[in-house]
Each structure stands twice: as C-alpha cells, then as structure tokens.
C-alpha cells in the first residue's frame, strides 16, 4: 500500500506502508542510533513525534518483550529508508511490522531519509504526517497544518501513570526513593532498583507534600516528552522538595524541571539531540562520556556562580547538567540508563545513592 509523508511546508515524500494502515501527525524528528528501534519507539519521550531513523536498514533483529521501555509504542509514527521483514535473531517473537500494527502505528519506508534528515538539520523539526492511501489528497496538508505542535503542550500528563505503584522489591533496601513519572523509561527504574533504592513511582501531578507525609528519603524526576515550561505543577513540587533539602536527581525532562525551579529558562532547540553518540564532558573530572540522548529542549546557562554547569555537550556546548552549591543535587540532560546506547554514564545511579547516604548521615 502507498504511503505519503507530508511536511508542513508542503513537501511530499512518497513511499510504502509497512505499519498500520492509518494516518498520524506529529513533530518530525530524527534519531541517529544504529540499533534500539524497539526501545526508541516505546520511550514515552517520543509522545506526539514521528521518528526518522537515519540508519538505512531497520527491522533486522525483530521484536522481543525484554526491550520494551514502556507498555506500548509511544511514538506517533516511524520513517525508515528500508524495512527488513525477515529478522535474524533467536530471541525475536515478531516482526517490527507486526509490532507496529499491534499498536496501530503507521510507518513508511522507501523514502530518502538522508534528504529528510538534512532538511530537518537545516530548517529545524517540522510538523508532518504519515498518510496511508492509494493517492495523495490536499487534505493531508490541511491536517498537518492543524497540528498544534509541542511547544507549550503538557505531554507529561498524557504519558504519566494513573496511580502510584512499587517497582522491584523493597525488601532489604536502605533508602526509599519517590520517582515522579513524567514518562519514565523502564530501564531507569531497573537501575534505580538495582542500585539499592526502594522505588515507588508517582503520577506527575502528585503533590510533593503528600509524598513527604508517606515518607521518602529522596526524589527522582524522570525523563518525559515535550516542553517543560507548561509543567507548573512539577516546578512547584520541585521547589518545595528543594526547600526541604531532599536529595534530588533529574534526568532529561527532570533536569529541565529542576532548571526551571531554580529560576533558569529553557529553549526549543532547532532539531534537538536524538541518538547514542553525543559526547559530553564531565566538568568535575574532565572525562568525556559518550551518551544516549533524546530531547528537543535545553536549559539556558545563566552563569550563576552558585549554580555551575556540571556537564557540557561538546558538539554544541549546550548544558548537560547543573549543580546547586551546598545542595544534594544531581541532574543530567542525557540518558545514563542508555536503552539504547552506551553505558558510559551508568555510574551516576550509584553516585546518587552515595549522595543520599552522605546526606542522611549529615
């Protein structure tokens, strides 16, 4: 079946459908990872986005339940150069096409993904849509132009859990950790659990005072989709957490929320960072880590002496982490849990545990 990718400037790419035969609109982004398409598709940070995978051949190793980063596909659509329908992997339980159809997600193959990626890199991430149809219709562009975009949209409330839950085991764990779910990835929870925390996950709008009354030793602010600026409830809760001096760790959107809570500003990036090869310098140690990233907004450095940058992106010098003088705080813009991506930064989970332990000892 034919499929059309339509951008908001009227550009049309014609290809072939290999997902569910439907239509979908969203922000068009690209990810440079060579593998990890299942983890990428199920990452809640991709809510309302259509993903272009720059690696030219996708689907080679199929789908396996262990690689899910949430309970379903979160992206609005998928764009690839060439889809492989015969995966070679003894663990594979279904094809990528079957996976997409199961969750009713459209996908298009056979288009020039290099041309599309260059367009995004030059012009920024456009709104667009995938339309499965036998022929093009002018209504496709009208539907794309009606998409409101992700700026000033609270997408965390779309992907957050509806009720609190315990992750992993609490038996024998020394510290209770409250995780705010703004779109948390499963591997983040796995690593928090594996590094000794008794993890309880809370809906995004849970008042921090309520969690404090229940009892916790520290807070974690998760990754998530879209613009942090409209998340007033998250910023207010974070400020109250910091007033009470709880140890605090934020990843990706969580890092941005902490930045806003400190009075900093965020900005929409031209095309963001999405892939598993972003070099980041640890300004404390001087070491360079290769990181996995997925974000389209960034914290602006306000050069406050008591809130220095802790990590710096070496490609475009954007802020990748911030500190607060005298406060037990750890933030990173990137994804230390990888899934997919390199494991250079997984030490941060143990570092946070040590920070909590040090804080509790006084």
From Swiss-Prot:
Membrane-traversing stretches: none
InterPro entries: Anth_synth/Amidotransfase (IPR050472), CarbamoylP_synth_ssu (IPR006274), CarbamoylP_synth_ssu_N (IPR002474), CarbP_synth_ssu_N_sf (IPR036480), Class_I_gatase-like (IPR029062), CPSase_GATase1 (IPR035686), GATASE (IPR017926)
EC number(s) on file: 6.3.5.5
Segments forming domain Glutamine amidotransferase type-1: 176-362
GO molecular function terms listed in the Swiss-Prot or TrEMBL record: ATP binding; carbamoyl-phosphate synthase (glutamine-hydrolyzing) activity; glutaminase activity
Residue ranges, annotated region (CPSase): 1-172
Keywords, alphabetical: Amino-acid biosynthesis, Arginine biosynthesis, ATP-binding, Glutamine amidotransferase, Ligase, Nucleotide-binding, Pyrimidine biosynthesis
Quaternary structure and partners: Composed of two chains; the small (or glutamine) chain promotes the hydrolysis of glutamine to ammonia, which is used by the large (or ammonia) chain to synthesize carbamoyl phosphate. Tetramer of heterodimers (alpha,beta)4.
Known function: Small subunit of the glutamine-dependent carbamoyl phosphate synthetase (CPSase). CPSase catalyzes the formation of carbamoyl phosphate from the ammonia moiety of glutamine, carbonate, and phosphate donated by ATP, constituting the first step of 2 biosynthetic pathways, one leading to arginine and/or urea and the other to pyrimidine nucleotides. The small subunit (glutamine amidotransferase) binds and cleaves glutamine to supply the large subunit with the substrate ammonia.
Entries under PANTHER family matching the protein: CARBAMOYL-PHOSPHATE SYNTHASE SMALL CHAIN, MULTIFUNCTIONAL TRYPTOPHAN BIOSYNTHESIS PROTEIN-RELATED
Protein name per the record: Carbamoyl phosphate synthase small chain
Organism of this sequence: Leptospira interrogans serogroup Icterohaemorrhagiae serovar Lai (strain 56601)
């Amino acid at each position: 079946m034919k499929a059309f990718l339509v951008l908001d400037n009227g550009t049309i790419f014609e290809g072939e459908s290999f997902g569910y035969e439907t239509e979908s609109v969203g922000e068009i982004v690209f990810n440079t990872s060579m593998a990890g398409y299942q983890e990428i598709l199920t990452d809640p940070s991709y809510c309302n986005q259509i993903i272009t995978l720059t690696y030219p051949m996708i689907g080679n190793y199929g789908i396996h339940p262990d690689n899910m980063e949430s309970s379903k596909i979160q992206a609005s659509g998928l764009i690839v150069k060439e889809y492989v329908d015969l995966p070679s992997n003894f663990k594979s339980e279904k094809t990528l096409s079957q996976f997409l159809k199961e969750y009713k997600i459209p996908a298009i193959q056979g288009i020039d993904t290099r041309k599309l990626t260059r367009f995004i890199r030059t012009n920024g991430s456009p709104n667009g849509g995938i339309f499965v149809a036998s022929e093009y219709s002018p209504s496709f562009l009208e539907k794309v132009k009606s998409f409101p975009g992700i700026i000033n949209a609270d997408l965390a409330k779309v992907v957050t859990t509806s009720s609190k839950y315990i992750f992993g085991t609490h038996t024998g764990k020394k510290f209770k950790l409250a995780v705010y779910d703004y779109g948390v990835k499963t591997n983040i929870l796995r690593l928090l659990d594996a590094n000794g925390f008794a993890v309880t996950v809370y809906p995004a709008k849970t008042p921090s005072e309520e969690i404090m009354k229940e009892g916790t030793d520290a807070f974690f602010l998760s990754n998530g989709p879209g613009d942090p600026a409209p998340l007033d409830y998250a910023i207010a809760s974070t400020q109250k957490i910091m007033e009470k001096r709880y140890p605090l760790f934020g990843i990706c959107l969580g890092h941005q929320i902490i930045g806003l809570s400190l009075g900093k500003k965020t900005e929409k990036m031209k095309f963001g960072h999405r892939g598993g090869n972003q070099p980041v310098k640890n300004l404390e140690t001087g070491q360079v880590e290769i990181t996995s990233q997925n974000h389209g907004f960034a914290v602006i450095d306000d050069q406050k002496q008591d809130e220095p940058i802790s990590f710096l992106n070496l490609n475009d010098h954007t802020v990748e982490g911030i500190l607060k003088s005298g406060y037990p705080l750890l933030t990173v813009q990137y994804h230390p849990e990888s899934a997919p991506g390199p494991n250079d930064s997984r030490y941060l989970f143990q570092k946070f545990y040590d920070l909590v332990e040090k804080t509790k000892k006084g």
